């Protein structure tokens, strides 16, 4: 189930994004980005619709994923 990011408080959204970024450990290429930059990048993707917040009832957790990969079950 998609969670509308706009309905979350700024603090909650930032905490979810930060948790996601720390969990992912994504490689950002030749130049390492700060945590703040990574959080800002993910937030931009949510705002643009490239990424979505997803609640998994099975795992009882929230994840961020590319909108193109989201398949509602």
From Swiss-Prot:
HAMAP family, A to Z: UPF0270
Pfam families per UniProt: UPF0270 (PF06794)
Origin superkingdom: Bacteria
TM region(s), chain numbering: none
Species this protein is from: Proteus mirabilis (strain HI4320)
InterPro entries registered for this protein in UniProt: UPF0270, YehU-like_sf
NCBIfam families (UniProt xref): PRK04966.1 (NF003438)
Descriptive protein name: UPF0270 protein PMI2817
Similarity annotation: Belongs to the UPF0270 family.
